[in-house]
Amino acid sequence: MITTIAFSAFAIASVIWMSVRTVRDHRAAMAERRGLLDDAARLLRDARITFSADHFPILAGSLADGRQIRAELIVDTMVCRRLPQLWLKLTLFETILRARPRIGALARPTGAEFYSIVHEMPRLLMPPPGDTALLMRGDGNASDRQVERTAAMFASLFSDRTLKEAAITPRGVRLVRQADEGQRAAHLLLRQARFSVTAIAPEIIRRTIAEAEVLSGFLADDEAVPGRRDFRKNAQRFLFQADPT
């Protein structure tokens, strides 16, 4: 009898301890998650950080030339038999609409990339040859020469296996790259998306911005679309649209 009571008390105490530990670990993870882009914020002018519904940070700021940058972190658990992915999605917004087509590429496509804008482009294009499987699409307004030049650029960019998506549009450019991969034990045993990264290194943000600037100046005339207004005054509105590009 005494043994049964003691065992029951131990079991109850263990459950309480595990519950308290789980809550404490969750709170610590949320606090750590919110600081992932703090170091990177120093790279931008007028940097400000807001938070998504799942407490991941969204960094917004500007470059020296006034163009706006938005960087956000996205958790992807959509693909079976693959560890959860933490993607860094960075968008560079032009101050004026550019006279260029929408064109982009997505690496190792599965069809489950809910964050992708390449999937929204209607025209299928021939991707460049290479070791990485690419889905290349556009809006149908690119010339053959533009498609060839962009394909060559993508072949170079996607030699980096961390790069998932690159897209050029009249309003801006976007890059998506892997920031971290989920912990195997947490995923297999607990079916949770836990990541080891405690901060996104400023070097990763700096490199991604540099690549975005190259893409921004890559296609055609780099001129404003005739009759369209200057977007500098309205940049903040575009920063917080779901898909501004």
Regions found by a protein language model. Give the residues of each.
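Feature marks short, highly hydrophobic, charge-poor N-terminal signal-anchor/signal peptide-like helices
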Residues: M1-A9
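Alpha-helical membrane-embedded segments
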Residues: S8-W17
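Transmembrane-cytosolic junction motif
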Residues: I16-A40
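Membrane-cytosol interface segments
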Residues: R21, D38-A41, R45-F51, P57-I58
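Short, mixed-charge, low-aromatic patches
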Residues: A28-M30, D46-A47, E165-A167
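Residues that form generic nucleotide/phosphate-binding pockets
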Residues: D39, L43, E72, L157, ...
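Charged, low-complexity intrinsically disordered regions
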Residues: T50-P57, S62-A64, V79-Q85, T91-T245
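Long, continuous compositionally biased terminal/linker segments
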Residues: Q68-T77
